Amino acid sequence: IVRNAHLINEGRQIELSNKSQDFFCLKRYDVQQILGVMVLLIRDKLPKFVNARPYDIQVLTPMRKGSLGVETLNGVLQSCLNPPSEGKKEVQLGDTLFREGDKVMQIKNNYQLEWEISTRYGMTIDKGIGVFNGDMGIIRKINTYEETVTVEYHEKKLVKYPYNLLDELELAYAITIHKAQGSEYPIVVMPFTMSHFVMLQRNLL
């Protein structure tokens, strides 16, 4: 990664030999092949290779729309990594289906949302306010009676969202490269095709 990062900064061709232990490139020739290999990597191969969970792997893509955009990728990855089951509750917001176990991201600063950290027995040991743009978490509980969604963020902070604030959340299996600026992830998967040709510039990387 470091070697190729320097090459990118220098405006030179990156090395695609796949001999590196932390950087490799897989060529596929249509969208379905790309989606297939992404699912295989994220669900099966990479977690074993680096001893990580699929949720630790972040997909970054240049655009929101299109066959390999954020919206399509989130739908595909949700269905493969967190498929529906009898024990998982769901809630629909517009075109987005949220399901218990989903990876989500806060998309705007909210200085009023309360969070708390509790013991396994339910005793609150810390609490505060504020959830911020770019924070990522996992949906732990959907209460259809209370109409709330509980998300667990970093350091086990639990935030309870009423349904009317769900527009502040997005699925986050895949996000745009722009949205990821300033963030770090253990593992990154990036799909590129010529359908992204408008965005395919050196500064994108």
Where are these regions (language model features)?
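Conserved helicase motor core of P-loop NTPases
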Residues: 1-129
